[in-house]
Amino acid sequence: MKKLITTILYFTFLLGISIKAEVPSKLIRNENGSWQLIVNGKPFIMLAGELHNSSASTTEYLNSLWEPLKTLNLNTVLAPIAWEQFEPQEGTFDYTLIDSLINGARKNGLKLGILWFGSWKNGESSYAPTWVKEDTKRFFRVKNADGKDIETLSPFCENTMKADAKAFKVLVEYIKKVDRETGTVIALQPENEVGIFQDMDYSKASLKVYGQEVPQALIQYMKKNRKNLRSELLSVWEENGARTSGSWKDVFGDNAWSKSFYTTWQYATYIDYVAASAKEIYPLPVFCNCWLVQKAEDMPGVYPNGGPVSRVMDIWKAAAPHVDVLAPDIYLSDFKNIVADYHRADNPLLIPESVMKPANAFWVFGEHGALCYSPFGIEDGVGNFTFAQSYKVLDELMPFITKHQGSNRIIGVMKTADESERTVTMGDYQLRITYDAEDAYGMIIQNEKNEFIVAGINFKVHFASTNPKKIGYIKQVWEGGYTDGKWKATRLLNGDETYHNAVLIAKGRRTLTSEKVNDYNADHTDEIFVYSPSSYQAIWSPGIYRVTTYLR
């Protein structure tokens, strides 16, 4: 018995070590088969915002932002750490800014995604340390077609890759040391919008690789996934005979695409090396963002050539197994098609940069089971009451969103310019959604067989039966909200507000708010809460409705 107790205690001790060693966040497949972010043991969706590039460069400026940011109802902030500040001299590391970020976020109940501005940011190398920039022999540059150096660090330079990876590993090791128990930092992004603004790197090292065999890892990936390859990659490969060996020119032809594919492979393997160095010690989820192709006719180099644009996602998937998510930065109007491109079976949807448009957030969380929506320059949005209230509504619905994430029991609603209505089947009901304004958006969750939670603004929902022998009706419509997961009704809607229970009218939530005297300015944070005591304005934002239905 004594031996048994000793054995149990030993394995309990080992289990304790295992639990402590576990990272606070991870990606899993939920029961719906959808990717889900788990934070501190619970499903988590990032209602996020990304800071401007320089906002976290001093503690003073950063500290002025926390209180204003809280008014936007965020739960996560994406913030940069620059290599030039973290390792100002080689081998000397400054933890001031990462400490400030973690402590500030923790005090304000926020999670963090850390963006590593290392070798590249927006295709340039301006965030590399001075000691890297000045040593052009050790850390050589990309060469243009004329053989001249440009300021961008070459992805073919092993010295740069190892120096970058070392610094990032030290940063992540420190995050593990100070934050593992609390789990404030939940995701990492190595580099930012990588790629070069030309067709290829003409450095000696690059030209040597271009003449070598295409890595078998890519060939085998293409063979295995041939039926699902992006058309841009598949068509070039097949037009050149779908060869399974040979140089980049042999396999993909002597053209702009072969140059782009090999450039992409190099960037992806470089960043995978950086990511792997960190994951080895603290395997937080890793995502890589990209500057999108702006026009269909744009060739590589018009946009940063080498980044994970949709055309070359398959190359990234083959080359960078330590990168969990390829993430689009979306400022283009074709939002629905872009997110559909990036939401794949092997790639959950995560949007680290976009515009401050709440409709986008409702769409990606409702329609695509997204992990994150994050407007860029989030501090500029302080005072945007509609956006803040939209995030509040999403937060109220979070238990239901995470419960049904990725299933057919949740959909997004967002009107596009050419759309007049949408019809969708949910369980035994056929829902016809019509729009009352251009800015119509929200989500619909079938929480029970005959109960729907509808959140949104400026649209109507008609409930019909999928069985032609039956008719669908609305039983009741309650307007209200959720506090800590508990429903609190504000009104029972009927009569004019539902056309006598013929339709759900998502008019929105009306809030009377004091008129703001001053716009937010980071240098005058005390002014954000200065209001006129006698002036009020009505603000409309998404509302929440519980709809019970029946068939007869």
Where are these regions (language model features)?
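N-terminal carbohydrate-binding accessory modules
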Residues: 21-74
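Aromatic- and carboxylate-lined catalytic core of secreted/periplasmic carbohydrate-active enzymes
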Residues: 22, 363-499
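C-terminal beta-sandwich/jelly-roll accessory domains of carbohydrate-active enzymes
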Residues: 453-552
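The substrate-binding groove and active-site-proximal loops of carbohydrate-active enzymes
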Residues: 46-57, 80-98, 145-166, 178, ...
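Aromatic-lined substrate-binding rim segments of carbohydrate-active enzymes
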Residues: 61-138, 267-281
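Bacterial Sec-dependent N-terminal signal peptides
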Residues: 1-22
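Catalytic-core region of carbohydrate-active enzymes that cleave or remodel glycosidic bonds
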Residues: 110, 273-284, 311-404
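Polysaccharide-binding and catalytic clefts of secreted carbohydrate-active enzymes
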Residues: 138-313
